[in-house]
Design a protein with these regions (language model features):
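Positively charged, solvent-exposed patches that mediate nucleic-acid binding
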Residues: 1-117
């Protein structure tokens, strides 16, 4: 199992948001930047405009869990920051929708490991 570390510092987020490539899905947006390490780094940012902390934490848990399940299929050496789209209603946020969105973003960015046939 790969080990992904979480981004913790403000400057780490800023570096990815300014220099990373932008990909968008229906529910989430992603900024992806390659790094020189052999492991992945993950950051999740949910705006305060989502009023209740319970809802923000629920979205973070859904994103983290989906990433954990897709982690084996993702190439290492990348830093990914996921952002929640402000206009999307939280009621539609479920595991399946976010997983589909995340898979689409990883396919667009070509981060999935190619399977040999």
């Amino acid at each position: 199992m790969k080990k992904t570390e979480m981004l913790k510092k403000n400057y780490e987020y800023k570096r990815v948001l300014t220099k990373g490539k932008y990909y968008s899905g229906k529910y989430i947006e992603a900024f992806i930047k390659t790094n020189n390490n052999n492991k992945n780094f993950l950051g999740i940012a949910i705006g305060v405009k989502i009023a209740k902390a319970v809802k923000r934490n629920h979205i973070k848990r859904l994103i983290r869990e989906n990433y954990k399940n897709l982690e084996e299929k993702v190439n290492s050496g990348n830093t990914v920051v996921f952002l929640w789209k402000k206009k999307i209603d939280i009621k539609n946020a479920n595991y399946k929708n976010i997983k589909q969105d995340m898979e689409d973003i990883f396919h667009k960015s070509k981060l999935f490991i190619e399977e040999k046939r």
